[in-house]
């Protein structure tokens, strides 16, 4: 799955302006590009025989996404401690959409994520225009 994560991180936003494009595009890109891999991974890692491998994999995910948040902190002006859980929400929404194509779940998660990011940008990056997502 590291190829999947590498592909995802290559599309990462370069700055706040790019953030909104990224959030709108990445769920559909993820489903199209990696949906089959996610479905296979979930079939394997939820099987009792392989559950311990899934737990180990996701422990690594926690570390990798925290590092990813640290790399975004200077670009977005938001502390990585705030970005890390938002990344988890985005990834969960993307994976759920890739697995089930549940548009309602995706849109509700994305809207809350965007609103939270707007508030964080205003709080931690006040030099940025408060009308960021017009």
Q: Language model features by range: what are they?
A:
Residues 1-8, 30, 65, 91-98, ...:
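Hydrophobic recognition helices of helix-based DNA-binding modules
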């Amino acid at each position: 799955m590291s190829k999947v994560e590498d592909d995802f991180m290559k599309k990462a936003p370069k700055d706040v302006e790019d953030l909104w494009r990224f959030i709108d595009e990445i769920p559909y890109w993820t489903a199209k590009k990696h949906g089959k891999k996610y479905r296979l991974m979930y079939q394997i890692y939820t099987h009792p025989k392989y559950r311990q491998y899934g737990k180990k994999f996701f422990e690594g995910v926690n570390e990798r996404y925290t590092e990813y948040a640290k790399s975004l902190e200077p670009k977005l002006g938001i502390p990585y401690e705030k970005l890390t859980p938002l990344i988890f929400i985005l990834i969960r929404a993307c994976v759920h959409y890739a697995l089930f194509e549940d548009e309602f779940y995706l849109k509700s998660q994305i809207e809350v994520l965007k609103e939270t990011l707007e508030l964080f940008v205003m709080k931690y990056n006040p030099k940025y225009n408060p009308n960021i997502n017009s």
